[in-house]
UniProtKB/Swiss-Prot annotation:
This is Replication protein 1a. It is a peripheral membrane protein. One of its GO terms (biological process) is methylation. Interacts with RNA-directed RNA polymerase 2a. InterPro entries: (+)RNA_virus_helicase_core_dom, Alphavirus-like_MT_dom, P-loop_NTPase. Belongs to the bromoviridae replication protein 1a family. Residues 47-341 are annotated as: Methyltransferase. It comes from the Viruses.
Length: 908
């Protein structure tokens, strides 16, 4: 790409373009040019209302909006929104051949974009549009023609009158500006496949209320249009339209049944509502009594609720990227090769029950939703139920003799549907063989089983009967109350002792100066930890009742429903396990018995943890000196623990906040088996505090609730406790929304030591960390000067592979799930996935050579954008020793991204 090409592409002169090309990569130049192309001037008529102008500027801040003395176009706000979207989409596509499906060829000719327009004449309205554009072109030439030295400086309009799916012109990218109404998702993808198009940007007028059955009509204030659902008329108007279509020599695809299919959607009730091909939706603009549009309802809803279409060997994935003033924007991306879990993604719900895809964006359970997304959420729930029914039917169809049961489990359900073993009723002759293959200790998971022919249930009646028995038994499963009277009793006793109510123990600082400060804070922090564990238990069991008990055959249901009761006699918190052909309670088993569990089963130790913390409250308090080692990122806190603690003499005990930190210490110490009890996680030690020590070392102490830290000190009966962490990195995070932590998250310590030298962070990162750290300084010993880069993606689906030598981080679990999907598509090993793909919260404490941080959404995300989330960004940028790459979707749209601002400052 030379300077002349750049000048022609952007319409501007660049004296130093050649130097820019030499300094930056081709990708970066194209990104800069795309942003410059999008920052163009769009002129609007003087008569446009001020409110409309302000909304246009808010929706499209990348353009400069200027007045001009021209007549107002029909439905002006919609027209200018369409114009802005067209320019924005062209800029996103970059300097590649582009097609416009049914677009305005006059605008492309006027702007000299070189876009090919497919403008089929399907009815009289299309003919009127064609005539109007020809007149506009003639008027434009009369007005602006004299300024061109030669007429041939203006190229001829690049258009055809073929349908997009019939056009033979090839391209790399495409636009679909208000054109998908007549094509639907299926025909749009067919048109992309024929033309070799890899990326399409499109929009339609859409109101979420269209998904609700009771809403047969509505009004969208932004675009100022009415919509109404009707059945196709067979009267005089229908005859007139058919006659008009025949005059142009073409027939409407909806008349011939092309590109239309019955679409099941959720319309505000529990019943299934079919949308046959004769249902239509009409649009009428309030500020234009003449113009109106009628389209096939199924085609419109295919864009609003669809996910992917397979054409040949190519999958086309649809992502809805935004809803602006009644305009739904979306992208369709071609995915070559195997598409992982494509059958599961055919609905708006993802492959995990905790993740739902709404309006093209994935949300994790607990994330806040914009109210505009609620109708999408209702549609997603409906599609989830439909998929569960489909999967049950799949299972019934597979219940035939001589079927390879293990292959069926592995390929169809990946050991997540352990409830099937209960419902299938394995043949008695194979029970002993099955148990021999899965002999392991409690808390283990099933290893790879050899292929073996087993005979599942072949009678549907037996399957239904077994499931009905299981459903009737739910009261017994849910019989135990999670309330713990002992907890309430001790709480009341402490309240009486302090002279205040039980509520004030956890939520008030009144008259604090009159109480022994240290004792009061210690006991209050311990009680808060107890209440958090109990609230966490309630949250998980409530989720299990809502998800798992509905249908034991549903792959989407997390199998937390099996864990309702705890057992003090076993180191296993599963409430029910599969053993000897049936589900039984662990309390009824021997300690070394054989059991079957699955990766979806969750250990629930909350009640046992609460009981352990209560024991710590009742213990006699032993004085312990608490020292906080406050070190910057990469200062060698773990190294100091390893070389200071002497666990072989059994005088020291090392506890860590997570399993990864424990494994890191093990790998450096290489201790014998006798040391295993002295290098543990905090939770493991609190559940079984069977060793004591004079000195207690706690790594990443800031991630643990202070109540648990104090309980560990009491159980260890230590004289000194050294707490290692960074007071300005991620602190303890409460995941239980029903119980907000009180004011005891700050641990009172006797001494504080500071470590200000980092051996990990490169110089450019250290310079920024110096501005982020408020309580301490930071200097580096690293010889790496520059380590930070960035990369912008068109969409999340553009991530086709992962660097096996890098660690891949995300801020949110939903983005992590997307990376895991990509890794499994590329046949990455599960051990590698567990080690190399983490959230930033999970990665706190690690030190690795190369890090890539991903952001897949362009709307506001607090951990990237909010000022109060500096701790997360501090952790993210301080994990690497050599390189850090920030990868985001459409980064130029993320104006509030504080992480991106940091990265831009570091790039030379």
């Amino acid at each position: 790409m030379d300077s002349a090409a750049l000048e022609k592409m952007t319409g501007a002169k660049f004296p130093a373009v050649q130097g820019v090309i030499e300094e930056f990569s081709r990708d970066r130049v194209q990104n800069v040019l795309g942003d410059m192309r999008s920052r163009q001037v769009i002129k609007y008529a003087v008569g446009l209302s001020e409110a409309s102008v302000q909304e246009l500027r808010f929706n499209w801040p990348c353009f400069t909006w200027e007045e001009e003395s021209v007549p107002l176009p029909p439905h002006p706000f919609a027209a200018y929104s369409r114009r802005a979207f067209t320019r924005w989409a062209i800029a996103q596509c970059g300097p590649v051949p582009i097609k416009d499906f049914g677009g305005n060829w006059f605008l492309h000719w006027q702007w000299q974009t070189g876009v090919h327009s497919c403008c089929p004449l399907l009815n009289p309205r299309d003919g009127a549009h064609q005539t109007r554009r020809e007149l506009n072109m003639e008027s434009y030439l009369r007005t602006h023609g004299p300024k061109y030295d030669k007429f041939n400086e203006l190229s001829r309009p690049d258009l055809c009158h073929h349908r997009a799916e019939d056009c033979s012109v090839r391209a790399k990218a495409a636009l679909s500006v208000d054109s998908a109404y007549d094509m639907g998702l299926k025909n749009t993808c067919k048109a992309m496949h024929r033309a070799g198009i890899e990326l399409l940007h499109g929009n339609i007028l859409f109101d979420p209320d269209m998904l609700i059955e009771a809403k047969m009509e509505g009004f969208v204030a932004g675009m100022n249009y009415h919509w109404k659902k009707t059945r196709r008329s067979t009267g005089l108007m229908s005859s007139f339209l058919e006659m008009g279509s025949s005059l142009f020599g073409v027939s409407n695809s909806s008349k011939e049944g092309e590109g239309h299919h019955d679409l099941k959607i959720k319309m505000g009730s529990s019943s299934t509502h079919m949308v046959p091909a004769d249902w239509e939706i009409s649009y009428h603009f309030r500020d234009d009594c003449v113009l109106g549009y009628t389209h096939n309802l199924a085609d419109v809803l295919s864009i609003a609720t669809g996910s992917y279409v397979k054409v040949g060997n190519t999958f086309y994935e649809l992502e809805r990227t935004g809803l602006k003033s009644g305009m739904l924007m979306y992208t369709i991306t071609a995915c070559k090769g195997l598409y992982d879990r494509a059958s599961a993604r055919s609905t708006p719900l993802s492959a995990k029950a905790s993740t739902v895809i709404i309006n093209g964006m994935s949300y994790q359970v607990g994330e806040k939703l914009d109210p505009i997304s609620f109708p999408y959420l209702a549609a997603s729930f409906y599609m989830q139920a439909q998929k569960a029914v489909f999967e049950v039917q799949q299972v019934v169809d597979l219940h035939t003799p001589n079927r390879n049961l293990w292959s069926w489990f592995k390929k169809k359900f990946e050991l997540k549907a352990h409830a099937f073993l209960f419902a299938l009723g394995l043949r008695d002759s194979h029970d002993e063989w099955l148990l021999d293959q899965i002999e392991f200790e409690l808390n283990e998971t099933v290893c790879t089983l050899p292929g073996e022919f087993l005979e599942p249930v072949s009678e549907v009646e037996r399957l239904d009967a077994a499931l009905e028995d299981w459903r009737r038994d739910r009261e017994r499963l849910n019989g135990k109350s999670v309330e713990n009277l002992k907890t309430l009793t001790v709480l009341v006793e402490l309240a009486k002792k302090l002279g205040i109510s039980a509520y004030e123990v956890l939520n008030s600082h009144q008259n604090e100066s009159e109480r022994p400060k240290d004792q009061w804070h210690v006991e209050a922090a311990l009680f808060e930890a107890v209440e958090l564990e109990r609230a966490h238990w309630k949250m998980l069991t409530a989720e299990a009742q809502a998800m798992s008990l509905q249908d034991p055959l549903s792959r989407e249901a997390k199998s937390k429903g099996w864990s309702y009761e705890s057992s003090d006699s076993l180191p296993c918190a599963y409430a029910y396990v599969f053993s000897e052909g049936r589900f039984v309670k662990p309390a009824d088993l021997k300690k070394k018995t054989r059991v079957l569990v699955s990766p979806s089963m969750q250990i629930m130790n909350q009640i046992r943890m609460a009981e352990s913390l209560e024991k710590a409250i009742a213990m006699n308090v032993k004085s312990c000196k608490k020292t906080w080692i406050d070190g910057v990122a990469g200062c060698g806190k773990t190294y100091e623990i390893v070389h200071t603690a002497d666990i072989f003499k059994k005088d020291d005990l090392i506890l860590t906040a997570n399993k990864k930190s424990q494994e890191d210490i093990f790998s450096q110490l290489k201790p014998g088996t006798d040391c295993a009890k002295r290098i543990r996680t905090v939770d493991s030690y609190l559940l079984k505090p069977d060793v004591q020590a004079k000195r207690l070392f706690i790594d990443e102490a800031g991630l643990v609730h202070p109540g648990k830290l104090l309980a560990a000190m009491r159980f260890a009966e230590c004289d000194d406790c050294l707490l290692f962490g960074d007071s300005e990195q991620i602190p303890f995070v409460n995941i239980v929304e029903s119980l907000q932590p009180a004011k005891f998250l700050k641990l009172e310590v006797d001494a504080r030591e500071v470590r200000e030298t980092t051996y990990r962070c490169p110089a450019d990162v250290t310079a920024t960390l110096a501005t982020l750290y408020k309580k301490k300084k930071i200097v580096t010993k690293s010889k790496v000067l520059k380590s930070v880069t960035s990369k912008s993606l068109a969409s999340a689906s553009a991530v086709s592979g992962l660097d096996p030598h890098s660690w891949h981080l995300t801020m949110y679990q939903a983005d992590k799930a997307e990376l895991v999907r990509v890794a499994r598509t590329n046949q990455m090993d599960d051990v590698w996935i567990k080690e190399h793909i983490k959230t930033v919260h999970e990665a706190q404490g690690i030190s690795v050579p190369h890090v890539k941080l991903y952001r897949f959404k362009t709307f506001d995300q607090p951990l990237f954008d909010a000022a109060h989330a500096e701790a997360y960004r501090l952790v993210a940028i301080s994990r690497h020793t050599q390189s850090f790459t920030y990868i985001g979707v459409n980064q130029h749209l993320c104006k509030a991204d504080r992480m991106l601002k940091f990265v831009i400052c570091q790039i030379p």
